[in-house]
Amino acid sequence: MKTAKELIFDRFIAPLQTSRANYIGIEIEMPIVNLNGEKTDKTVSIAAMKKAIEHFGFTPQKFDDDGVCHEAVCPDTCDIFSFDCSYNNFEIALGRVRTLHEAQARFRDYVSFINAELYQNQHTLTGLGVNPNYLINDFNFVPSPRYRMLAGYLKKAEVWRSISPAGSDFHPYYGFGTFSSASQVQLDVNEENVCQAIEAFSLVEPLKAVLFANSTLPELPELLCVRDYFWERSAHGINPRNVGFFKPFPKSIGEITDYLSKASIFCAERDGKYLFFYPIPFDEYLNRDRIEGEYYDGAYHPFRFSPEAEDVAYLRTYKQIDLTARGTLEFRSACTQPLHQAMTVAAFHLGLMNRIEALTELLSRSFLYREGGDPDLLRRKMNRVDFLSAVEPEALKVLLLNVLTLCAEGLRERGYAEELYLEPLFERAKTLTSPSLRLLRHGGDLDSVIREYAAL
């Protein structure tokens, strides 16, 4: 069997050596909200997706244990409709696009149609990072093998609390995937720029918290964005290499390979069974004779198996920035945005990818980092309601505007007039107001915010 590092290289590094045409990958998850303030009716969600599949000519691809389609793909564009974790959370994953205008046009068409269907039953997709009715919603995951595995794994934190070094920090929201939504972007990278891109975009993470925070919980009134909390204080965070930031920033391909070889694997598949187990660093996993796992078949049952080299396909992390097996960096930390501003997240990353060196230089000499600031600690501060107590507001405003100006230059250089998608971010920077802050300052009329953030 190949070593862990050799397997990591083949899966994650080799794709960086292939020349590609700099496409954009965009995935937007959206909560399905019952406008009557009641729990989401999954029959309404399922019916709306069925109509959308028929209307847009998608092909049903995955079905749950009850025969309900929970994922469908467009044969022409490779766009995907799916329910992410639960029937309360709808995801549109756009196939590779060359311009943001192309992405925006398809996204608008899909959301307009689906919301027209949902509105007939007083439901809507909206642009919030947490479903506002999460406390009364059904927390059940989609009843399919993969999601039953994930549900079992996250719930197992109750048992692992006593044996994990991170156990005392576990949160009680084991079903957070059923009510949290993100806007994720994938951009092509190569061997030459991947390390620099990881560093530059890690440095900008605290500023992203200021611009994109859009997930609040009444039980955690101090936080503007609960995404980091959900992932880092769940079973996914047992190994710090699987969440958060690269520490330290990798300076070479060898350092990336070494880092990922010590990230943990927590699932595999045998005999058609999706298995989960206590997360094990991948290099240790390959050296084990037997692994004690569990699978679902009416209930969770034990299953012993031996590691195989092919299991590297199940190794994945949930970091702020992930290196994927497609030769891309996936940016995962942004909450879903108000739907009329859905392309802001992609525009931000796309523009800065064209200005990596200038971004690194700007941030390194900024007040955030010139005295050795830690982007992880800074992001935690910026995620808080009282973040302005940790910085000088005018200095923060100037830095945000300078970063956005760099971003606009990067987009302008592409020649597609995509910089227009940054306009809401310039306004947020000038006022130091994220969608979360806007919601909190709205005065409690949640229904009007739900409708406003659902508008295109």
Predicted regions and their residues:
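Acidic, His- and aromatic-enriched active-site or binding-groove loops in soluble protein domains
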Residues: 143-170
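Short, low-order "capping/linker" segments at domain edges
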Residues: 138-152, 227-238
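C-terminal accessory/tail domains of diverse enzymes
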Residues: 1-91, 95-97, 176-177, 192-199, ...
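Glycine-rich, histidine-containing beta strand-loop boundary motifs that form or position
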Residues: 30, 94, 122, 127-131, ...
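Structured alpha-helical segments in the cores of large, soluble enzyme domains
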Residues: 76-80, 110-114, 118, 160-175, ...
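Contiguous, non-catalytic segments that form substrate-binding/exosite surfaces or channel walls
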Residues: 99, 104-144, 231
